[in-house]
């Protein structure tokens, strides 16, 4: 999710598309953050599923995002694990509901745009990476977006992503973890990486 957010910012995602970075005690995959009674029409955080699906709307061609991740990881053969993608698409009813809520609140203009963003998000979640590869991508962030002396990511976008991880990277346990392990920026995910 942080890499989706960074990529979206690099592609021109306006900060107002993710209205603010607000930690919440809600689960990462709830659509409650977009309910009419919350008076919010934009996801409040780029690291919950609503925010990540919203960020995925900035991916015009998924191959471009994959090329970005290949560059960061140093693996030119990085790919989507098609069996994981197919399984996720068959069982992601909650994320479909979130994408439709994003359409209903005006984040996406059409149902097709919302479903394309959902597809991009699901494909991104199914990219097969090793711990060494994700570490290499994180090293690029730690070096301020530099690879071999070339600025490949805006430092401002890295700061935004790190701040997002610091405020909600471990979802509803972020506050507890931040208190016990001050300064640790992390993101929990299903892969365990």
Explain the meaning of each model-derived region.
Residues 119-121, 144, 156-159:
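Cytosolic covalent-transfer regions centered on His/Cys nucleophiles
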Residues 148-193:
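Conserved SxxK-family serine transpeptidase/carboxypeptidase catalytic domain
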Residues 10-124, 140:
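Active-site-adjacent helix/loop patches that line small-molecule binding or acyl-intermediate pockets
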Residues 98-100, 125-127, 161, 191:
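Structural beta-strand/beta-sheet cores of well-ordered domains, especially the beta-sheet scaffolds
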Residues 112-113, 130, 136-139, 148-160:
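A conserved catalytic-loop motif detector
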Residues 2, 128-146, 193:
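Active-site-proximal alpha-helical segments within enzyme catalytic domains
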Residues 1-14, 137:
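Active-site SXXK
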Residues 49, 92, 128-131, 155:
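Electropositive phosphate-/nucleotide-binding environments in soluble metabolic enzymes
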